[in-house]
Amino acid sequence: MPKKLVLVIDRDDDLGQKAGISSPVIGRDNIVSAAVRLGTADPEDSDVNAMFAAIKIYDELKGRGEDVEVVVVCGDRSVGVVSDSKIAEQLDRVVLNLRPSSAIVVTDGSEDEFVLPIISSRVKIDSVHRVVVRQSRTIESTYFLIRRMLNDPKIARITLAPLGMIFLVYSIFLVMQHPEWGLGGIIFFLGVYFMVKAYGWEQNIANLLETVRVSLVEGRLSFIFYVTSAILLIISIVNGFNAAVNIADAAQAISSFIFYSTWWFVLSGIFALLARAADAYAEKRRVSKYFTIIFLLIAFGLIVWASAAYVLNPEAPNALQNLAGAIVGAILIAAIGVFTLKRL
């Protein structure tokens, strides 16, 4: 009879962080022991319920005479690339040792379900069992549930951080006596936030902030480049905003924003790339690719700036020729950057 796997995923490694248990944990008795230890360390952790739910499913399948095993696989507290890589590596070992034909995935219904594609690429998933803990419906229990959720760092980062930024953005425009601009600022921030969440850029941003922190602590030149880049980015946004704020026509407003902010944005990118190059040089890594990207960024800026200029004033003398010349110039600049990379 083909072996079936009852699989619990602990993506943020609560089992390791709170109970000190390394994964994977294989076997009914081992998982019962692990669940008890985790429940003792943190009785409110939902992974405890997921593990006991997996034990219940295991017992039911075993009672029907099926060949089944139960396993808990953990990731890392740094949820994202790091945790998912650890889960993938442990799953490979489990599949190699147990040779399951299919799996039943047990989840607490949170971010653990993001790893389902990783699991399905290694073993066929027969079912996903989501464990939802029943709560008392009184006002008091709801208050304590919300309070506990907000004390959870994972939930706080998702809820409190954007709310705090919204209040901060609005208060800045309120102090400037332009509360009507606050709505635009909030919509802009929410747009950026949703894009970051949609494309999973949180880890990239966290890595960038950590790089800046390390450059400051170690006294690297790159820290000055990072600060300069941030200042230039702010100038870029302010310049574009000031140019576009009083223009009624949407196309003209967008073009004005782009026209007056592009080169500040390009300068910001150049300083950011110089910072990365300085870090790479300090760590004895290759730096030539960063200079190539600088050429490509300048080429990109030239095309965007020239296009915005054409949209703003298409009737100007030689407007189309200037746009064509900018495109040709951008191609030449990009070619120089690529050629430089190949030579170095």
From Swiss-Prot:
Keywords, alphabetical: Cell membrane, Membrane, Transmembrane, Transmembrane helix
InterPro entries per UniProt: DUF373
Membrane-related topology note: Multi-pass membrane protein
Keyword Cell membrane assigned: yes
Subcellular location: Cell membrane
Principal cellular location given in the protein's record: membrane
Coiled coil location: none
Family: To M.jannaschii MJ1032.
Name of the molecule in the record: Uncharacterized protein AF_2058
Annotated organism of origin: Archaeoglobus fulgidus (strain ATCC 49558 / DSM 4304 / JCM 9628 / NBRC 100126 / VC-16)
Upper lineage: Archaea, Methanobacteriati, Methanobacteriota, Archaeoglobi, Archaeoglobales
